[in-house]
A protein has these predicted regions:
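ABC ATPase nucleotide-binding domains
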Residues: 3-4, 195-234
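Conserved ABC ATPase "signature" region
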Residues: 79-94
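Conserved ABC ATPase signature
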Residues: 98-102, 106
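Catalytic Walker B motif of ABC-type/P-loop ATPase nucleotide-binding domains
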Residues: 123-126
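ABC-family nucleotide-binding domains
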Residues: 133
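H-loop/switch region of ABC-family ATPase nucleotide-binding domains
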Residues: 158-159
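Conserved beta-strand-loop-alpha-helix hinge in the C-terminal portion
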Residues: 178-202
Length: 234
């Protein structure tokens, strides 16, 4: 159950919704997608926007025996659109493969491509980084950020705090059906003791606003450079 929620997803935003198991994240997403009907309240979608949801098991979207047929199905048999999407998502070499034979990252790209071919402008993604290695996560993140720059709005339910810290434009935390906090990633993670990144937890005493390893390393280097003695003059 979720209680008295007021969530706004802005155009061009990549909002990561965090929280423990049973917090209500997936239930909220299903209500936004129309799969569950709330007892009270409304879900408002801006005029001209189309919402689609990617479930945690992305394979559940696949009904064909090749990647090409999956894209054609979502493109309503428009081959030009399917080919263009395959090129954009770097799926062209995989068109003859069965969707179940793809890697985790390739499965996510294909699933997102199917939603985009349905002309989705608001994407709800449930645990899209689950099971992905660091490279596949980075590839997925770059795709999502590119979509945001084009005007899409994306809500990601995730336990992956490192992914959220590195790529999200906004973060929110749910607990027991309540939205406890929301904000820009640096302010959000720096203000949390439990739901924060390893980098922030380790370096909080010295660099409280650093939330990624790269930021901590940069701050350490800057601090060391400032302490280096100036060379003697003359």
């Amino acid at each position: 159950m979720y209680k008295r929620q007021d969530v706004t997803l802005h155009q061009g935003e990549l909002l990561c919704l965090l929280g423990g198991n049973g917090a209500g994240k997936t239930t909220l997403m299903q209500a936004l997608a129309g799969f569950r009907k709330p007892y009270r309240g409304k879900v408002k979608l801006a005029k001209g926007q189309r919402l689609c949801m990617l479930p945690q098991n992305a394979r559940s979207l696949f009904v064909a025996d090749t990647v090409e047929k999956e894209l054609l199905d979502s493109a309503e048999q428009d081959k030009a659109k399917a080919v263009q999407m395959a090129e954009r998502l770097e799926l062209t070499p995989l068109l003859a493969r069965h969707p179940y034979d793809l890697s985790g990252g390739e499965i996510q790209r294909l699933a997102v491509g199917k939603l985009l071919l349905r002309e989705a402008t608001v994407l709800l993604l449930d645990e899209p980084t689950k099971g992905l290695d660091a490279y596949a996560k980075a590839e997925l993140a770059q795709l999502l950020l590119a979509l945001c720059r084009e005007g899409a709005s994306i809500l990601v339910v995730t336990h992956d705090v490192e992914f959220a810290a590195r790529y999200a434009t906004g973060c929110a935390l749910m607990f027991d059906g309540l939205l406890l906090s929301e904000g820009e990633p640096h302010a959000f993670f720096a203000g949390n003791r439990f739901y924060t990144t390893d980098a922030n937890r380790i370096a909080a005493e010295h660099f409280p606003m650093d939330i990624t390893c790269e930021e901590v390393i940069a701050s350490c280097r800057s601090s060391l450079s400032a302490k280096e003695p100036e060379p003697p003059r003359g």
